[in-house]
């Protein structure tokens, strides 16, 4: 399987639309292709890029990332999304996608390669440790409503 997979950036709207079903496996709250496309378009204005793994003309995995800069890490690539279609879990494809994103970070002369995963996702955490990533902190989130911001 691995030798038949090509990893390349999604550049066209047609390819973005074709990626929806795979992204929905990771982000089940995504309601439809149009909403997904609009969200990716907004994220692209902030530097978001989407790598796709193609096999036999179909997208079977995705890695979404963006270049960032902050006082903690300096210049770094942040991985927003990493997903491999369920039928290809444990095939090595996740490792290949993560490596492709890491290579982008190196090419962009980044000092760090960063991602988050849910505390409830033990298998993902084990995968990231095996890929050489280390847990360096916790990510805190507060959902905001309009009432809370006024």
Q: Where in this protein do the model-derived segments appear?
A:
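Short acidic/polar active-site loop segments enriched in Thr and Asp
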Residues: 49, 111, 134
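Conserved GNAT acetyl-CoA-binding A-motif
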Residues: 105-117
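Conserved acetyl-CoA-binding loop-helix of GNAT-fold acetyltransferases
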Residues: 84, 90-103, 130
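Terminal substrate-recognition subdomain of acyl/acetyltransferases
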Residues: 2-3, 103, 134, 138-150
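Conserved active-site alpha-helix within GNAT-family acetyltransferase domains
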Residues: 95, 119-138, 142
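A conserved beta-turn-beta hairpin within the catalytic core of GNAT-like acetyltransferases
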Residues: 69-79, 89, 135-136
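Residue-level recognition of the GNAT/N-acetyltransferase active site
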Residues: 68, 85, 118
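Acetyl-CoA-dependent GNAT
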Residues: 2-74, 99, 143-145
